Amino acid sequence: MTWRAAASTCAALLILLWALTTEGDLKVEMMAGGTQITPLNDNVTIFCNIFYSQPLNITSMGITWFWKSLTFDKEVKVFEFFGDHQEAFRPGAIVSPWRLKSGDASLRLPGIQLEEAGEYRCEVVVTPLKAQGTVQLEVVASPASRLLLDQVGMKENEDKYMCESSGFYPEAINITWEKQTQKFPHPIEISEDVITGPTIKNMDGTFNVTSCLKLNSSQEDPGTVYQCVVRHASLHTPLRSNFTLTAARHSLSETEKTDNFSIHWWPISFIGVGLVLLIVLIPWKKICNKSSSAYTPLKCILKHWNSFDTQTLKKEHLIFFCTRAWPSYQLQDGEAWPPEGSVNINTIQQLDVFCRQEGKWSEVPYVQAFFALRDNPDLCQCCRIDPALLTVTSGKSIDDNSTKSEKQTPREHSDAVPDAPILPVSPIWEPPPATTSTTPVLSSQPPTLLLPLQ
């Protein structure tokens, strides 16, 4: 009896030891480092590997995937698999049964979106054991970059180059300008005359930003290579867009300026006297009322900001769009956006169409503000906006047979972009007909699109 009791006790201990050993053999491993990064709209596979001391029988095990967003501290079930039952709570979510047999419980999610970033938890049950692991998923979007040359309103020998980066996420981005000369072939960062605007959020959650570089070509060496360098979390290497400065535009010497002045000073003097007499003949009261009360469309909107539906808009964004971004856009029907704003219905409509076609959805609400101003005659009268501007439907004359400027779509940049020439672009607007408006006349020089060579 004693021998049999001892044998039974030994067998029980062996069974208990085997059970304890088995429970410790189930383990789940996720992505190394605890963070997985994936591009926007990609078909992502979130890794989850099962390690078990025994061969896996998928008919007697279960897999459940959970997701917790970055903004809400609540888990949501994404996918579950138990025996012959599987259900996807997120469209397209799947765990391959065939791979599960070899211990691969990875979750596949097609077309991942920005809002799906967060913590994912893989829970594995092999009765009576359970193991789990978590991973942080980050969704990023790479910026698309292009260069524009904007000469509107610039002085002689001055150029403004705009580097637009769009469609990136997360918001943090770094844009710098560099130059390389024949004397100094290594890139030198430029810190002066560089203005980078605010980041603008698009409707899809991505961001846009524009950085401007102002150059005085007469003070720079021809052949100097300039680069707009974009650094972002989604890029393995910086995104570079290049252009080469050509020969500086002709600048008169002091002798030439003196000679030209001596030749033409008599006509200029007569013109000056005529202007003075004209000003004297105009009633002083009319000049006073006109100059003291008239507002440009942009200033009118800013002054009466609360009269518009601007709860989600910002004044500094409107100023940046109206004075810097919109004047560089190539609009159809020969229209160009003036930096002081416009109540010309055709100009506003063409700007609205351009922003929608180019996917600049964050700018559309700001365009609507000028529609609202035009549709408010009392406010236009209060700001003393010229009524003639409200009746103008196009900036072109009836006899203008010039062809419409074709919209140019920039080619997509690679990480390293070679030198890009400045391509000529046909004029995108003509001076408006003469009116009594006090609106300043803009330069007819259009912005030039810089396309990097592939």
From Swiss-Prot:
Cystines in this chain: 48-122, 163-228
Gene Ontology CC, one term: plasma membrane
Stretches in topological domain Extracellular: 25-262
GO BP terms, alphabetized: NK T cell activation
Signal sequence annotation: 1-24
Chain ranges of the Ig-like V-type domain: 27-138
Segments of this protein annotated with the region Retroviral-Gag-like: 291-429
Assigned keywords, A-Z: Cell membrane, Disulfide bond, Glycoprotein, Immunoglobulin domain, Membrane, Repeat, Signal, Transmembrane, Transmembrane helix
Low complexity composition bias: residue spans: 435-454
Domain commentary: The C-terminal part is similar to retroviral Gag protein. This putative protein seems to be the result of a fusion between an Ig-like domain-containing protein and a ERV.
Name assigned to this protein: Natural cytotoxicity triggering receptor 3 ligand 1
Lineage: Eukaryota, Metazoa, Chordata, Craniata, Vertebrata
Encoding gene, per UniProt annotation: NCR3LG1
